[in-house]
């Protein structure tokens, strides 16, 4: 896996699924391919994106700044600085300085990532802040190692909370989660249908699923009644995709 592919993988792992994730993936690909060279416009776009947490915006802003060539005197952005200040905790700043000194001795992406993984997310964010504010310099490769270690910490905690939801024994939460997933799947089917010949069929399946979820929410049903709904929908979507020759990539 190339370095930039690895960075894209880690960064996207902390972005919530949805149309915005696909949009961010496209921007990252363009930036890494050297197709997008307007850092100012890119940062303005990032600043106004909904849904993303301040820290995720800060990390993306840091990655864009590292990658897009820019004028020496280009102003640093406040929304990135605020996100990368380690919650204003002086302990995070102390640890960030220690980490920075260690990173100065590293020359490889993997070496930097290994060193960074033993620090907390707050310390890692503060260390990124140091570099972003030009208080310290490391190679781009080492900075990317720091980014990926931070994303791994965030993705780990997201995965833990996701796993808690999936394994929860509370039937009401499981039921609601299945209905939300069914609605999301229906939306994906409608987006993929486009203007193809099978579009009508996909829209029909998606529409039925929506109506069923709406009915379940309106009249209230037994929590176990939604169990088959999401699976049926996913099965229909996969069959439809196979006929269309579409890969199950970004959707998984």
Curated annotation (Swiss-Prot):
Keyword field: Host nucleus, Membrane, RNA-binding, Viral matrix protein, Virion
Main location: virion
GO cellular component: host cell nucleus; membrane; virion membrane
GO molecular function list: RNA binding; structural constituent of virion
Biological processes annotated in GO: viral budding from plasma membrane
UniProt motif (Nuclear localization signal) ranges: 101-105
Annotated region (Membrane-binding), positions in chain: 1-164
Location(s) in or outside the cell: Virion membrane; Host nucleus
Region (RNP-binding): 165-252
Topology class, membrane: Peripheral membrane protein
Note: Most abundant protein in virion. When expressed alone can form virus-like particles in transfected cells.
Subunit structure: Homodimer and homomultimer. Interacts with NEP. Binds ribonucleocapsid by both interacting with genomic RNA and NP protein. May interact with HA and NA. Cannot bind NP without genomic RNA.
Role played: Plays critical roles in virus replication, from virus entry and uncoating to assembly and budding of the virus particle. M1 binding to ribonucleocapsids (RNPs) in nucleus seems to inhibit viral transcription. Interaction of viral NEP with M1-RNP is thought to promote nuclear export of the complex, which is targeted to the virion assembly site at the apical plasma membrane in polarized epithelial cells. Interactions with NA and HA may bring M1, a non-raft-associated protein, into lipid rafts. Forms a continuous shell on the inner side of the lipid bilayer in virion, where it binds the RNP. Determines the virion's shape: spherical or filamentous. Clinical isolates of influenza are characterized by the presence of significant proportion of filamentous virions, whereas after multiple passage on eggs or cell culture, virions have only spherical morphology. Filamentous virions are thought to be important to infect neighboring cells, and spherical virions more suited to spread through aerosol between hosts organisms.
Entry's family note: Belongs to the influenza viruses Matrix protein M1 family.
The name this protein goes by in its record: Matrix protein 1
Gene: M
């Amino acid at each position: 896996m190339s370095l930039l592919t690895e960075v894209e993988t880690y960064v996207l792992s902390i972005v919530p699924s949805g149309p915005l994730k696909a949009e961010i993936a496209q921007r990252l690909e363009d930036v890494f391919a050297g197709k997008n060279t307007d850092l100012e416009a890119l940062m303005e776009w990032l600043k106004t994106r909904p849904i993303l947490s301040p820290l995720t915006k800060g990390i993306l802003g840091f990655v864009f700044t590292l990658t897009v060539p820019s004028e020496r005197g280009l102003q640093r952005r406040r929304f990135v600085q605020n996100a990368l200040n380690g919650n204003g905790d002086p302990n995070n700043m102390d640890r960030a300085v220690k980490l920075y000194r260690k990173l100065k001795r590293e020359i490889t992406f993997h070496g930097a990532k290994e060193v960074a993984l033993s620090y907390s997310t707050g310390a890692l964010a503060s260390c990124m802040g140091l570099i972003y504010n030009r208080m310290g310099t490391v190679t781009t490769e080492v900075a990317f190692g720091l980014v990926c270690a931070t994303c791994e910490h965030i993705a780990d905690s997201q995965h833990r909370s996701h796993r808690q939801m999936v394994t929860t024994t509370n039937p009401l939460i499981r039921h609601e989660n299945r209905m939300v997933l069914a609605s999301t799947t229906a939306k994906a089917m409608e987006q993929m249908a486009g203007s193809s010949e099978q579009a009508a069929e996909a829209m029909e399946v998606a529409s039925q699923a929506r109506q069923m979820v709406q009915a379940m929410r309106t009249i209230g049903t037994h929590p176990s009644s939604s169990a088959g709904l999401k699976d049926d929908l996913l099965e229909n979507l996969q069959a439809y995709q196979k006929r269309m020759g579409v890969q199950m990539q970004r959707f998984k």
